[in-house]
Amino acid sequence: MSDPAKVRRHAERVRELVASVVRSQIKDPRLGMITITDARITADLRDATVFYTVLGDASAQASTAAALESAKGMVRSTVGKALGLRHSPTLTFVLDDVQDQVKHIDDLLAQARHADAEVQRLATRAEYAGEAQPYRLEEEPEGSGDEVPPPGGDQR
């Protein structure tokens, strides 16, 4: 199967099904506040990667990962039946670090804004390092440099 549109539709359907199963069928107390953010499936529809985020600290993320691993078989069975494919895709759950990347980029942008403000503040008090006009504007004396020498060199 190499139809990208069909693969995309199946990936979206896997995301919806996994979110539904996690919300309604998994009763594991280790499962935290989870959001299924994305799903990707291979072109042969055999392997699916499901991305999720968890609200909480590292321990909540670890316990949610353990809960998803223990419920992986039941989730795969439900997804396989709902998709109606010959083979149920193998599910791999991956913690989505988009929120961490967004925070890191926001921090970098804040640092850049702070540095720009500092440069702007220093520029308002800036003075010339030398004179205001560094190039000398002297009038040239008469007969210097404007005359063209006669052809053949200097004739005396």
Swiss-Prot record:
One Gene Ontology molecular-function label: ribosomal small subunit binding
Record's keyword annotation contains Transferase: no
InterPro entries membership: KH_dom-like_a/b, RbfA, RbfA_dom_sf, Ribosome-bd_factorA_CS
One GO CC term on file: cytosol
GO biological process: maturation of SSU-rRNA
Family the UniProt entry places it in: Belongs to the RbfA family.
Subunit structure comment from the entry: Monomer. Binds 30S ribosomal subunits, but not 50S ribosomal subunits or 70S ribosomes.
Protein name per the record: Ribosome-binding factor A
